[in-house]
Structures are given as structure tokens and as C-alpha cells.
């Protein structure tokens, strides 16, 4: 009877949502029913070192910090996976069948994707955990060989110097985690505009009492819309969890008016970042000076990587600069060593204006 009652409640949720739109939102409903929804994977959900939980229909794959990706000895029952799918579909108020074979749901802590068995033999489920806290401190980064302390100091000082920063890398490399850490160095009275389609940065929770506004984008209000609107909302720092499309043109336009940014993007090489950003424009009509604007308004590019054991590190550090109508990309750190390239003078001037004489020494 209890299971029937629970199933009935789940079935009613879409209708209740329409009748009572001011009640708990869908994310809260999923979060509050987490223990029941994820009963067979509760141990993995509650383990802070686990970043991803994936069921391919045959094996349960776990990705864990310091260990990597491995097959768990646990096997999920078909009935359990079916029930999770039905309950999530009911909560979201969507169909999940051969015609609509992709089911996605998000909370503040979890990003869930399930594929229907009509398209992949058995149901496939992927859960990415989004921590609401910082995974590391300055000390943790140094002790874990994430990068030399001088590089960590450089990154922190770059925020103080108001450099616009792009963190690149492949999926699972820890791009957003680095942005979250660097966001703690933004002064409390400088307004951060955090624009996301799925909550990942958690700026307000990580930085309580700092000046900020968090805005969720969708098909109705896009990244382009909110970046443009931010110009009239006194935004000092634009934080994008990921740059992936034509919104980069509006981002650069905002930077040209005096804002600063932190964002992530998929990237293999620091030197490729300007071309990568240009390719994001798609068929958008922009003038041929776009690449020049990238070099002028993006200051620092960081490439992070992750090995098979989920050990993360900084692979490259590069500065972009445009002086005397010439574009420069100076990679000063690569594969664990400093190169013989020097930081551009116009970048050094930005540090000096904030009272930072040695960019590699910790301030305060």
C-alpha cells in the first residue's frame, strides 16, 4: 500500500505543479526524495569523493577522485532502474519512451541523464555530482601537486588584478572547480553575475554575503540575452559555467565596456583558444576583427587536465595580449615547467595597477 501511495503521489506531481506553481520547484522535489530515488546507490551518492555514477545496463561504473573510473561490484536491478525512470519522468512532467528516449533532470547537487532501452538495448543512466562546496584550498592545491605554489599565487593574483580568465580542458578535467576556487578571490563589493543553464558554480553558497546575482538561462532567456542585460545591471564580473556558442560575441562586448569574466570551455591547447572561441560563433554575423577582440579582452588562459586516476593538474598557463596591432599568446608554463617566454608588459601593468609587484608571490 505504501508503494502504491508513493507511486500515486509521483504520478500526481505534474498536475500539482500546475495547480500550485508557488510550491516546491522540481529540483526541491527530487532532492527531498533523494533517499528513495537513489536507494540502491545511496553509498555512492553520499561519498564526496565520487564524482560520477554510471549504469550502462550491465555494469555500474564509478568515477572517484584519486582512483579513477572502475566497475563496482554492485549490480542494479532492472526494476530499480525502471522505477527511477518512471518517478523522474513524473516529477519532470515529461514522457519517456521510444519517441522521447532522453530523460534529463537536475538539482543543485546532481545532473541526471537516462536513455531509453528502445534505443540502447537496456536503460543507461548517468549521474554527475555537482558539489556545493570547494573541493580544495590553496594548501590542498600545492600539496596535491596541482601546480607549483608560484602558479597558484599567479592565478589568485590574476583575479585581484582583474584579468579576464578562461579555464580550458576536457570533460572531467575540473574546469568548473577551478573557477569556483578563483571566484573566492573576487572582492566582496564587486558584483558577480553568474549565468548558468545548470547550477554548477554555487557562487552564493561558496561566497556568502558577497555581491552577486545568479541567473538561470533557458530557451526563453538565453546567454546572449542575459549577458546583454547585464550591461544595465551593474555587473562587474561575468561568470559562465561554460562558453559553448554565439554568446561569446556578447561576452567580449561586455568585456569591452569594463567588465571582467571567468568561464570554461572545452580545449586541448592554450594557443588554440582564440580559434576555438571564433568557431563557437557558428553562422553568426560578426566582423573580421573578432579574433583581435579575443586577444584584447581575454587576458589569461589556463589548461587543466585529469589522468586516469582522476588526479588533476594545471598543464598550461598562457597570456593573451594585443599590442601595436599585433596579437600575442605567451605560454609561460607547460607540462610542469616554466618556459622562457615572458609575461607581456600590458598584462604586467594590470598587476602593477593593483599593487602587485611580484605576480608569483602570495598577496596578503
Describe every region a protein language model picked out.
Residues 165, 183-293:
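Switch/coupling sub-region of P-loop NTPases
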Residues 175:
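Conserved lysine of the Walker
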Residues 172:
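Walker A (P-loop) phosphate-binding loop of P-loop NTPases
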Residues 167-169:
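Hydrophobic anchor at the beta1->P-loop junction of P-loop NTPases
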Residues 178, 182:
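Hydrophobic positions on the alpha1 helix immediately C-terminal to the Walker A/P-loop
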Residues 47, 59-161:
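P-loop NTP-binding catalytic core
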Residues 16-35, 39-40, 309-364:
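NTP-binding/hydrolysis catalytic cores, primarily Walker-type P-loop NTPases
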Residues 1-96, 107:
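N-terminal accessory targeting/assembly segments
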Amino acid at each position: 500500500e505504501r508503494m502504491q501511495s508513493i507511486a500515486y503521489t509521483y504520478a500526481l506531481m505534474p498536475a500539482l505543479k500546475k495547480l500550485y506553481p508557488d510550491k516546491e520547484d522540481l529540483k526541491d522535489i527530487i532532492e527531498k526524495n533523494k533517499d528513495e530515488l537513489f536507494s540502491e546507490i545511496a553509498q555512492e551518492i553520499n561519498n564526496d569523493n565520487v564524482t560520477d555514477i554510471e549504469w550502462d545496463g550491465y555494469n555500474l561504473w564509478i568515477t572517484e577522485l584519486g582512483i579513477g573510473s572502475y566497475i563496482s561490484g554492485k549490480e542494479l536491478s532492472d526494476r530499480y532502474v525502471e522505477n527511477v525512470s518512471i518517478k523522474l519522468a513524473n516529477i519532470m512532467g515529461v514522457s519517456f519512451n521510444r519517441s522521447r528516449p532522453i530523460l534529463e533532470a537536475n538539482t543543485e547537487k546532481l545532473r541526471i541523464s537516462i536513455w531509453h532501452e528502445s534505443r540502447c538495448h537496456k536503460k543507461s543512466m548517468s549521474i554527475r555530482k555537482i558539489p556545493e562546496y570547494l573541493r580544495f584550498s590553496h594548501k590542498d592545491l600545492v600539496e596535491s601537486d596541482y601546480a607549483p605554489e608560484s602558479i597558484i599565487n599567479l592565478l589568485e593574483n590574476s583575479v585581484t588584478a582583474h584579468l579576464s580568465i578562461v579555464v580550458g580542458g576536457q570533460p572531467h578535467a575540473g574546469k568548473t572547480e577551478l573557477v569556483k576556487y578563483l571566484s573566492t578571490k573576487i572582492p566582496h563589493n564587486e558584483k558577480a553575475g553568474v549565468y548558468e543553464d545548470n547550477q554548477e558554480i554555487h557562487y552564493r553558497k561558496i561566497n556568502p554575503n558577497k555581491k552577486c546575482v545568479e541567473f538561470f538561462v533557458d530557451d526563453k532567456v538565453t546567454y546572449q540575452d542575459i549577458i546583454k542585460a547585464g550591461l544595465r545591471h551593474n555587473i562587474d564580473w561575468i561568470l559562465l559555467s561554460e562558453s559553448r556558442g554565439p554568446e561569446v560575441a556578447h561576452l567580449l562586448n561586455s568585456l569591452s565596456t569594463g567588465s571582467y569574466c571567468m568561464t570554461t570551455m572545452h580545449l586541448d591547447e592554450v594557443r588554440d583558444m582564440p580559434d576555438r572561441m571564433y568557431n563557437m560563433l557558428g553562422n553568426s554575423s560578426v566582423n573580421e576583427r573578432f579574433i583581435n577582440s579575443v586577444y584584447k579582452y581575454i587576458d589569461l588562459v589556463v589548461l587543466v587536465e585529469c589522468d586516469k586516476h582522476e588526479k588533476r593538474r594545471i598543464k598550461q598557463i598562457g597570456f593573451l595580449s594585443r599590442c601595436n596591432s599585433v596579437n600575442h599568446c605567451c605560454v609561460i608554463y607547460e607540462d610542469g615547467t616554466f618556459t622562457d617566454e615572458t609575461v607581456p608588459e600590458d598584462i604586467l601593468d594590470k598587476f602593477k595597477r593593483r599593487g602587485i609587484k611580484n605576480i608569483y608571490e602570495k598577496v596578503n
